[in-house]
Amino acid sequence: MINITLPDGSRREFENPVSVMDVAQSIGAGLAKATIAGSVDGVLVDASDVIDHDASLRIITAKDEEGVEIIRHSSAHLVGHAVKQLYPDVKMVIGPVIAEGFYYDIYSERPFTPEDMAAIEKRMGELIAQDYDVIKKVTPRAEVIEIFKARGEDYKLRLIEDMSDDIQAMGMYYHQEYVDMCRGPHVPNTRFLKAFKLTRISGAYWRGDAQNEQLQRIYGTAWADKKQLEAYIKRIEEAEMRDHRRIGKQQDLFHLQEEAPGLVFWHPKGWALWQVVEQYMRKVYRKTGYGEVRCPQILDVSLWQKSGHWDNYQDAMFFTESEKRTYALKPMNCPGHVQVFNQGLHSYRDLPIRYGEFGACHRNEPSGALHGILRVRGFTQDDGHVFCTENQVEAEVTAFHQQALAVYQHFGFDEIQVKIALRPESRLGDDATWDKAEGALRSALSSNGVEWQELPGEGAFYGPKIEYHLKDAIGRTWQLGTMQVDFMMPGRLGAEYVDENSQKKHPVMLHRAIVGSMERFLGILIEHHAGQFPAWLAPTQVVVANITDAQAEYVSDVTKTLADQGFRVSADLRNEKIGYKIREHTLQRVPYLLVIGDREKENGAVAVRTRSGEDLGSMSLQAFIERLQAEGA
C-alpha cells in the first residue's frame, strides 16, 4: 500500500505505484486536466512519473510559479520542434528558462531573419493546435548518444560528453518526431503552451566564448494564459518607451560608440544629471560620518594578489604593463581604502572609521552582456568602507540600512526587498568565519524587524552581503545597494588597530554602496521616471522662452536670476513660434517652461507652464522661485 499525503494533510491510499497524473485523476477530472507536473517530497517531477513509496505530493498547475516555469521550458522545446521542421539542417544546442521567458541557441549556416522568426512562431501555433502529448522516455546514455548521432545533433553529443560518468540515463522528451534531452519536468500536452510569443533574435557563442562558433539565439516568452501574455506584452511596450538609450538620445544625455565598448560619453545635460546625484550622495557621506577619499585607478598586480582578487576575479580585470611591472585597472575600490587605513596607527577608540569614494572602476564584462549604461565596463561607484570592531557591526549595518532606505525613497522608489547573498563555492576563509559574517547580517536585519530572502551561493568571494532590490514604476526589480561583511581582506592586506588590551587586531571591514554603479543607477532613474524627472533632479529644470524679440532682454534677466539662485536653467531666444518652442521643450520633458510676452515683461512676471501642459498662469519670479524651492529644487 502506498500513502500519498496532499498539501491539506489528507491522505490517499493506492495498492500499486501511481503516477502524479493518476493521483490527480483520483481527486477529480478537472484537476487532472489542469495538471502540469508534481512536487514529490519537494522535488519537481513529470506528471507521468511514478511514485512507488509513501510520499507527500503537491500537484503543479499553471496557477503555480513552477507551472509557468515548466510552460516556458516546454515552449523552448517547441521552438526546437518548429525550427527542425522548417530548417532541418540546423543543429540544436540548449534551450533554458530565463526571467519571464526562455531562449533556444541554434547553430545555423545563415543568420535567422525577422521573417524566419515569424515563420517559426506560426509553425509553433500550428503544432500547439494539434494538441499532441509530450512523451517522456528515460533512456540509457549509450542509446541517447546513438539517437543524436543519427540525427546529426553534434552539440547535444558535446553536452553529453561534458556530463559526469555517473549519469547513465537521461530523460528524452518527444514532441512527435522531434526529441530533446532534458532533466525536465515538461508539460504533458501542448495545450498548455498557447500563451506564448517569440520576442527577438540575437547572436550568441557556444559556451559563451567569443572564440567559439557563433549561434543564433531565439528568445520568447510564455505564460499561463493569454491575459497574462497580453499584460506582459503591454509591459514590454512600456519598457521600450522608457528605454534609457532612447531617452538618452532624445534628451541628449549621453552616447556610446564602437571605439569604446562599455564606456559612456556623457553630454552636458547628462553630466548635469550625474552631478545632481553625486552631490546628493556626497551630502549623505558627510551626514553619516564618511571621510571622502580618492585612490589610484591603477595598482601593481601584487596588491591584487594579496587581496585575493587575483585568484578569484582576474578574468574580469584589465591589465597593462610598464617598465617590466604588471598593473591592473581596479575592478573594486576596497584594497585602496585599506591602504588609506594602513597609514598610521589606530586605536579601538578611533573605530569605526568610515571612508567613501566616487571610485572609477573597470571590469572586463563580455561584449554580449553590455547593455546601454545599465551594463558597462567602466563605471563609478558611491563606494564606502567601514573599519570597525565585531561589536560595532550590527550598529553600522543598522545605520546603513536606514540611510539606504531614505535615499531610495527620495529618488522615488517605495517598494524595496531585502536579500542576503550567502557564501559562494569559490571563496576565501573557513566556514567558521563565514558563519560569523552571515550571522552578523541576519542579526542586524532581525533587530530592525526587517524581513529578508536568502540567496545561497551568491555572496562575494570575501564575504556575504545584504542586497537591496527596488521595484520600478512598471514593476521591474533592480538590485542596487549592498552591505557586505568582510573578516578576511583586512588581514590579507595588513590592516590593524590596537584594542583595549594593547593587542593588535584586524578590524572588520564593511563594504557598502547605496546606488552602486552611478551609470547603472542613472539608467534605472531614466527608465523609472520615463525621462520625466522631478524638478529637483531634472538636468534642465526651467526653460525661459520669449514670444518676440522685444522680450529678449527680460528673458536674459530672468534666466540670470534663476541661474544665480543655483537652478539649472536655459533661455530659448530662437526666432520660432512660441507653440513650436512649447512643444519641443515638452517633448524634452523639461519640468517648467516660462513664457515671456509683453505683459510679463511690463509686470516683471513669468507665465508658467508645466511639461504636462498645465497652465499655472502668471506669477512673480519670486513666487516661482519659492515654488521650485518647495519641490526641493
From Swiss-Prot:
Q: Does the keyword Ligase apply?
A: yes
Record's keyword terms, sorted: Aminoacyl-tRNA synthetase, ATP-binding, Cytoplasm, Ligase, Metal-binding, Nucleotide-binding, Protein biosynthesis, RNA-binding, tRNA-binding, Zinc
| Residues bound to Zn(2+) | 334, 385, 511
Q: What does this protein do?
A: Catalyzes the attachment of threonine to tRNA(Thr) in a two-step reaction: L-threonine is first activated by ATP to form Thr-AMP and then transferred to the acceptor end of tRNA(Thr). Also edits incorrectly charged L-seryl-tRNA(Thr).
**Which Pfam families has this protein been placed in?**
HGTP_anticodon (PF03129), TGS (PF02824), tRNA-synt_2b (PF00587), tRNA_SAD (PF07973)
Cofactor(s) essential for the protein:
Zn(2+)
Provide the assembly information: Homodimer.
This entry's Enzyme Commission designation comes to: 6.1.1.3
Q: Where is this region: Catalytic?
A: 243-534
Q: From which residue to which does any coiled coil extend? A: none
The species this protein belongs to is Stenotrophomonas maltophilia (strain R551-3)
Q: Which cysteines share a disulfide bond?
A: none
Q: What is this protein called?
A: Threonine--tRNA ligase
- UniProt xrefs under NCBIfam families: thrS
Q: Where in the numbering of this chain does the TGS domain appear?
A: 1-61
